[in-house]
């Protein structure tokens, strides 16, 4: 399997899983692979800067295991995005199982990949009611070919996939603008990036495909939650005026799940943007200053709105207290 690197996401404390994966590779006569140290949700603390990517996230992302899983894939993508050589990567979670003749069948799949196919699932969770009806394509098919992702059947899962730097960079950029608001497998699914799947599937996991028995999963059975800290706002910019605990209703271009430096970078690049607030909204218009509304401190010790100075000067909005 030339031009393919294998990465296994593994928690440092789960040496048992590492050993099991090593045995699976040995059984398949696979000698070239590396383990990538996963983010351990147990060790995440409210003040960790990396948690900024979850701002505005759905409730489930406060679970430590889910957050750790998302961060693990995100950091793997950052690593892969830096490799522009054209090498493809197979990313595996450490609780997967290989289907029979995995190495041989993976080689068959690799030979059918088209240059445009940059993100390919070789296993996924299928909606329960669809398991039987999809058996012919996901279990019994022997074509070992690539097809557009069956979105009608997809119920999640990033436990085994092939990608290259193009897909990795897309997801990294997507997160830099939007943050991680939903669980990581659905983020890729909803991001708009073209996704594909192998027929048949080559890997599966018991963590979601089981008949009710207990399974060893650091995500499914980890319910402790992260309490996100309100962090200081020490950001001052020469080309923006910050008005604490105020916002302008309406005039929104889009919501961006990001911290202040990234929000500013986005605002700087958008000629239509005149302001952004620390809740994550980039704006193309603001109300007169006397009509600004009050907002509380949700993410920072001092939330508020940053307004471009050149906009204030252009509109001849001059307030002595803002030192314009």
Swiss-Prot record:
GO terms for molecular function: glycosyltransferase activity. It comes from the Viruses. Pfam families: Glyco_transf_25. Keywords: Glycosyltransferase, Transferase. Its EC number is 2.-.-.-. Belongs to the glycosyltransferase 25 family. This is Putative glycosyltransferase R655. It comes from Acanthamoeba polyphaga mimivirus.
